[in-house]
Amino acid sequence: MGDNVQSDTTAAQAGITDAPTAPTSAPVSLKERLEKLIESSQQLIKRMDENNIPDPTFAPECQEDYSKLPPETITERFALLDLLNDVTFLVHGASQSITDVAQNAMADSATLNILNYFNFWDVIPLDGDASFAEIAKAVRLPQEAVEAILPYAFSNRIFEPVTIGDPNSRIRHTSRSAAMIKDPTLRIIVNLTIDGLAGPLSILNRALEKNFLGKEKLTNEISETPFGMLYNKGGPLGEYKDYYDWLDRDGEGERKGWRQRDMVESLRLAKEKMGAESALLEALDWAGAGKATVVDLGGSGGHDDVPLAEKFPDLKIIVQDLPSCQPKFDDGYISDELKKRVSFLAHDFFTPQPVQADIYLFKWVFYDWSNKDIVKIIKALVPALRPGARVLVLDLMVDVGPEAAAVMPRSLLKYSNVISLKTLSLFGHTKQATKKMTDLFKAADDRFEIVRDEVAGTFMTFEAVWRG
């Protein structure tokens, strides 16, 4: 994954006196931004009118559908968000805009996490309202706490008082809070990203200071990551081998593994939206593979393999993942008929591969593992490989090259750049440590013959053949 976070550090600050002068962008002013904002806003209104999209509001019944807009409007909308952000910063002023982030960023996340964790969403009827006392009783928290949490949420258009200015007003949904009921996957996203990542991200500075101050390179050692400081050996929040072990084992009784189940579901939905099914079906000449045995490593609940098994009835597919993924495999999504050819085998892909197969498949697995770990995973295949066995890697291309970054809206770039912060906090590496599959497979074992190493759109396709 490539470099796309541009440093603003000057050559003088870096101790370089003969560095070439970098090109500078045109000055941005409040007046210029406001004028452009009006122009871009009118363009969006025109697009919505042309495609019969109702004017979005904060009413709970509102459910905007921007999917009807032409594909090019995705970038246009993010460019509009850039303008809105710039106007916000410039209207506040440099100092106040920084102060606002310092005061509000953590509170924004914490409030959303609290509302989600205690399920405020279902307490208030979509077409009704509730009092502070009724809400407090339903979520089993002191009313005093609820009266502090909800007003902050109001400022972010999450719930609202029925009567503005009345301290005793009843509370109702807005479109933002109602979305948490209409689309339950949003709850999973909040669980995974805020409840799961807030702790490690909040101590990233301490981890960098303790383990990497004055050093030139990261070590990729879990014990030196923020996650490791909290959850690894001697960690105050438990002892887990790594982030995935935590996902797999967190919780007790029926709750054990709930985070892993959420992760499986979120990945399934994300891949649906990104067209991952067609990418998998077109990644290989599956019909030409004949009666092949396919091992899908890190295959979660096996849902991705359903269209593959349906379209190519000669394939026998073995889904491998941690034990907590088996309930997803058994949830009825895969028919009994298909299960004659699609099975589940609990397996940790860092341990030696127990199955001899024709094709080993890694779908959207490697993008958040370090290069060192990827090499270990590949090496674990070797004991089972027969000459001619193939390894197919399909992965997300989350890096953005410098040329694309130069023209991409900053609001859109955030989705790519935030991955580096997350992986740095959880795994001790960044997506900037480019994952060149050819190099990684050769580092694992030079008996791999590289057949393909391609990038198309948001997907990377790699194929190697074992010549041992």
Curated annotation (Swiss-Prot):
Keywords: Methyltransferase, S-adenosyl-L-methionine, Transferase. S-adenosyl-L-methionine binds at G298, G299, D321, D348, F349, K363. InterPro entries: COMT-like, O_MeTrfase_dom, SAM-dependent_MTases_sf. Gene3D superfamilies: Vaccinia Virus protein VP39 (3.40.50.150). Induction: Expression is positively regulated by the leucinostatins biosynthesis cluster-specific transcription regulator lcsF. O-methyltransferase; part of the gene cluster that mediates the biosynthesis of the lipopeptide antibiotics leucinostatins that show extensive biological activities, including antimalarial, antiviral, antibacterial, antifungal, and antitumor activities, as well as phytotoxic. This is O-methyltransferase lcsG. It comes from Purpureocillium lilacinum. The gene is lcsG.
